[in-house]
A protein has these predicted regions:
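Short, small-residue-biased leader/transition segments that mark boundaries at the very start
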Residues: 2-9
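Conserved catalytic core of the tyrosine transesterase superfamily
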Residues: 10-296
């Protein structure tokens, strides 16, 4: 009979095999590596907390774990991330039933997103000395792109004829088209001619030629924010928030904004309704509108 440290070693090996299964199943379901790692880390925390053989797990165990985290002060968004990992583990890896009534998702306590004024957008871009990152930030704002989407763009994804951008590396695994701003295209064209005329990866790492990681643009954005004297809480996703909010200010219907942002659920887009909605008058990137700052 195993006791003490021997039992811990046995349990560690047992858990490791299940953690590896998360990776295998995740790859088969075409999950992104970052999502798989998040699931693995969350499930590891859960298994350490419950200390039971995975085959013996129940929904009550998951509920106890999430309640424990809730009582520790974790936010609803964190609880829902843990919930999503456990749902995947139970249903896809263990083949167990999941009871949404017993283990419901937390009601999100959404905060109003940080939105830059149009003047602040101009200040940020003016303070970005590196032309590659200036083009990246211009695309993120003018087209509402996530940082992961813009760094995975390829030359052929940019349609100058239709003034559209094809997004194939989206968070929701759903391809979509985003609008292409003329001003952003002008900046992008300048970058392209002055920075090696890349024909594959649009923003390659200058040393490896591979895709950039998100850390580079985030660091450059922080530097530009400091140089421009802008509030220090501005981060990369604020550019996407600003795109959506400025479109709402310009009267674009929220259903079209949902499509442009690639949101599966309208609830994800409704967070921008703190600004009054108007009638659809035609979709043009807010980046092509200079002056007349309506947001401060």
């Amino acid at each position: 009979r195993l006791v003490g440290s021997e039992m811990c070693i046995r349990d560690s090996f047992m858990y490791e095999s299940y953690i590896n299964k998360i990776e295998d199943v995740g790859k088969l379901r075409n999950l992104k590596p970052g999502t798989i790692r998040t699931y693995q880390n969350n499930v590891k925390d859960f298994l350490k907390f419950i200390n039971k053989h995975p085959d013996e797990l129940t929904c009550e165990d998951a509920r106890d774990f999430l309640l424990f985290l809730k009582n520790k002060g974790n936010k609803s968004s964190t609880l829902n991330n843990k919930n999503g990992a456990l749902v995947f583990f139970y249903k896809r890896v263990l083949g167990k039933l999941w009871d949404d009534n017993l283990v419901p998702r937390a009601i999100n306590d959404y905060a109003i997103p940080r939105v830059l004024t149009r003047s602040e957008i101009e200040m940020l871009l003016d303070a970005t000395s590196n032309l590659k990152y200036k083009a990246i930030f211009a695309l993120m704002y003018s087209s509402g792109l996530r940082i992961s989407e813009v760094i995975h763009l390829r030359y052929e994804d940019i349609s100058r004829t239709n003034m559209q951008i094809y997004i194939h590396e989206s968070k929701t695994h759903t391809a979509r088209y985003a609008i292409l701003s003329q001003r952003a295209l002008d900046i992008l064209t300048e970058y392209w001619f002055k920075c090696g005329r890349p024909t594959g990866i649009l923003f390659p790492n200058q040393w490896t030629g591979d895709y950039l990681t998100s850390s580079g643009p985030r660091l450059e954005l922080k530097k530009a924010v400091n140089r421009a004297g802008l509030p220090k809480d501005i981060h990369s996703h604020c550019l996407r928030h600003s795109f959506a909010t400025h479109l709402l200010e310009d009267g674009v219907d929220i259903r079209y904004i949902q499509s442009l942002l690639g949101h599966r659920s309208p609830k994800s887009t409704e967070i921008y309704l703190h600004i009054s909605n108007k009638t659809l008058i035609g979709i043009h990137s807010p980046f092509d509108k200079k002056g007349g700052d309506k947001n401060g």
